[in-house]
């Protein structure tokens, strides 16, 4: 599908994406890199899809140049103008996935452009530098042979190395004897190369009969059997060979696109993910122009739109989650206006049978996540209606795709918090959906915005088990010293002590008393009074 250079009209109250002025292929790629932990893999899928659709070879030189180009942006509360390159204006998750993708396709990148990008990345003066980005940048610089020689040194922080070693020791109980990465020993490599074909099997037998005498857990044994089965398969095909019709791909000779395997048979990249087909089903490929026309109709607000969902939308049931990702990117769903979003959601909610949970999660992320994170003022009524309607039917997908990312995003502010509070206060929210939301919030690190959303949810008198209530009380009491001046925390405490008075045990009451002791908000007297009502 040839994506037009100009995107669909932006959503109401949403700032344009930093890459909005780039050419269509670059926009599609950067948009795919926004997809959380799977962003790098989705980026590879977009590259392959662009090739199989007959586009020109992806111009990495032009994209790297655009990433380094400085543009004036408004910074700080005083609204001062500063020159800032596009790379540093990208969201943090997009920067991470971009660096991962650059590592994967490094052999096909112009070295001068890559060096410029790495230099820009080093100039990031953020108060909380990202250790993951630093490590990826260091690895890329090593590959290019620039900077101080650090052969044998790890780009990971000492804390990360300790955690990795601990993880390897834990996994080693399964008999795999995992070790943290170390510089290869030339003598060991030479000895390994000279081993006879039967050596590996013998070693495996000796390992199985090791004096440790520990039985391999069933789950780990299943993983091992699966890995052995994978090793017996032919070498993974390149991305080009997976394309329908065998059409030539402009990116066919990129070494990165083939799955690299080490001598131990383990993949350097996620072989399973790369081998997974990212081609759209033939039926959907044929209907792409019609789907684009439907979205255009939604945007233009034409009268007489059919109430029943168009038959073309039934084809969504034929997509796997990865194919749904690709379809959302090609249709530029994140750039729908709020009116178009509401109308599309109306159609999606009327589909029969319902969407699968995994596909509904992908759609939630594509339609809502970027839109919510970009809000600078209160969400429009159209956006709020679309989100609450979608959540009423697909609660689990909305929770998994939105709650965690929005509450943990560094840029979450009043606009995002207000929308989440509206979401958890929905009258149509079933009790089990309330418990689901509560469980997800309890697993997150808490901050000011979390207090507000949690207080709105608990106002609904959520029915929870004693175990879950105990977790809530424990986290609540632990936050007392760190939230002595927080009005949001004080309101949350007041809600818990009044709405859930019958659930609070004597031990929990003592914990609340200690947590409230240093509180300095003007609700202090009300909190003390509520605490007295819990008295023995």
UniProtKB/Swiss-Prot annotation:
Residues 171-252 are annotated as: Disordered. Belongs to the multisubunit FA complex composed of FANCA, FANCB, FANCC, FANCE, FANCF, FANCG, FANCL/PHF9 and FANCM. The complex is not found in FA patients. Interacts with FANCC and FANCD2. Residues 150-371 are annotated as: Interaction with FANCC. Coiled coil: none annotated. This is Fanconi anemia group E protein. GO terms for cellular component: centrosome; chromatin; chromosome; cytosol; Fanconi anaemia nuclear complex; nucleoplasm; nucleus. One of its GO terms (biological process) is homeostasis of number of cells. It holds the Pfam family FA_FANCE. The modification Phosphothreonine is found at residue 346. The gene is FANCE. It comes from Homo sapiens (Human). Keywords: Disease variant, DNA damage, DNA repair, Fanconi anemia, Nucleus, Phosphoprotein, Ubl conjugation. The lineage of its organism: Eukaryota, Metazoa, Chordata, Craniata, Vertebrata. It is found in: Nucleus. Phosphorylated. Phosphorylation by CHEK1 at Thr-346 and Ser-374 regulates its function in DNA cross-links repair. The modification Phosphoserine is found at residues 249, 374.
